[in-house]
């Protein structure tokens, strides 16, 4: 019997939060929307609506480590926002190393002949999908490894 998962991937930035969801099997992540950050309460309300609609069980948040692997100022800001958000939504959080996901998202847009400079929200959604996909892939690999060990 397959265990269903409903995770929400978030790419948290100063101005926007990219949001991604996954299919119920946990195989494919896709961008859903971009939340324009205005106030914390409004941000929570917009994300709460998505959480309710999709019956989300866990938040997967990209943590922007520095290239040397340390947590810089931006990573601490993301943790602070996420901690408050998780408490408001009463959901667990799992962090994923998001180094270079925005760059990867921009490269994907360029490959599609879409201007990254005019589509910042789309970059955030794609980055959120990359973050969530990374988490889903790790989760699936770990599940397969534990099944292999049982035999």
Swiss-Prot record:
Gene3D superfamilies: YqgF/RNase H-like domain. Could be a nuclease involved in processing of the 5'-end of pre-16S rRNA. SMART domains: YqgFc (SM00732). The keyword Hydrolase applies. Its EC number is 3.1.-.-. It is found in: Cytoplasm. One of its GO terms (cellular component) is cytosol. Belongs to the YqgF nuclease family. It holds the Pfam family RuvX. Keywords: Cytoplasm, Hydrolase, Nuclease, Ribosome biogenesis. It is an enzyme of class 3 (hydrolase). InterPro entries: RNaseH-like_sf, YqgF, YqgF/RNaseH-like_dom, YqgF/RNaseH-like_dom_sf. The keyword Hydrolase applies. GO terms for biological process: rRNA 5'-end processing. This is Putative pre-16S rRNA nuclease. One of its GO terms (molecular function) is nuclease activity.
């Amino acid at each position: 019997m397959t265990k269903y998962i409903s995770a929400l991937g978030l790419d948290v930035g100063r101005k926007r939060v990219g949001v991604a969801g996954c299919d119920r099997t946990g195989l494919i992540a896709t961008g859903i929307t971009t939340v324009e950050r205005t106030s914390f309460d409004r941000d929570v309300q917009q994300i709460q609506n998505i959480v309710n609609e999709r019956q989300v069980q866990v938040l997967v948040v990209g943590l922007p480590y520095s290239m040397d692997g340390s947590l810089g100022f931006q990573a601490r800001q993301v943790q602070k926002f996420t901690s408050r958000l998780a408490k408001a939504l009463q959901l667990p959080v799992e962090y994923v190393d998001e180094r270079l996901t925005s760059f990867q998202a921009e490269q994907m847009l360029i490959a599609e002949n879409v201007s990254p400079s005019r589509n910042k929200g789309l970059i955030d959604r794609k980055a959120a999908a990359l973050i969530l996909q990374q988490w889903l892939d790790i989760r699936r690999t770990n599940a397969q490894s534990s099944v292999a060990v049982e035999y």
